[in-house]
Amino acid sequence: MNMCLLGTIATGVETLRATVKYNMKRGASEFCSEWTLADTGNNGFVWLGNITDMGGMGAFLSTDEEMKWDKDNGCVYKAYTMSKMSE
């Protein structure tokens, strides 16, 4: 995993989980080979993904459709890149 999104979602983490699954079917799987989503309580979440094309991921997250979805669902997050420390 090389990307982490840490945030909150007003409509609940299961809403986000359903949307991630939908997005993977509509093309996000082209640049995200695997992902996991953890519910941290109080509508908080940690999403981890293995991104094979950071430019593609950035472009996907910044589309008008995605930004509207975030606003409509009260989804606020910070994105972090990560690297594996050792084998």
What are these regions (language model features)?
Residues 1-69, 75-87:
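Short S/T/G/P-rich N-terminal loop/turn motif that feeds into the first structured element of a domain
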